[in-house]
Amino acid sequence: MAVADINKSEVIKQFARGTNDTGSPEVQVALLTTRINELTPHFKANMKDHHSRRGLLRMVSRRRRLLDYLKSNDADRYRALIEKLGLRK
């Protein structure tokens, strides 16, 4: 399940650091968070879908690695992103 193009472009605009920014950690984390949030209802309805759950866990761990990278390089940007996305910590 992919993020819709319109929704994806809105997320990129909201979290981009510049006009053509699509690869900064903030944008990547925001896109992963959007995909994770879209998949959550699927797993509540389909608890035995272990194949897709593996993909979800990969996305969660990738988001965690990006957040760790951002935290080690710029703690202020990390805190702002966590607050803006409503993630824990």
Curated annotation (Swiss-Prot):
One of its GO terms (molecular function) is structural constituent of ribosome. SMART domains: Ribosomal_S15. Keywords: Ribonucleoprotein, Ribosomal protein, RNA-binding, rRNA-binding. GO terms for cellular component: cytosolic small ribosomal subunit. CDD domains: Ribosomal_S15p_S13e. The keyword Nucleotide-binding does not apply. It comes from the Bacteria. It holds the Pfam family Ribosomal_S15. One of its GO terms (biological process) is translation. InterPro entries: Ribosomal_uS15, Ribosomal_uS15_bac-type, uS15_NS1_RNA-bd_sf. Belongs to the universal ribosomal protein uS15 family. Part of the 30S ribosomal subunit. Forms a bridge to the 50S subunit in the 70S ribosome, contacting the 23S rRNA. One of the primary rRNA binding proteins, it binds directly to 16S rRNA where it helps nucleate assembly of the platform of the 30S subunit by binding and bridging several RNA helices of the 16S rRNA. Forms an intersubunit bridge (bridge B4) with the 23S rRNA of the 50S subunit in the ribosome. This is Small ribosomal subunit protein uS15.
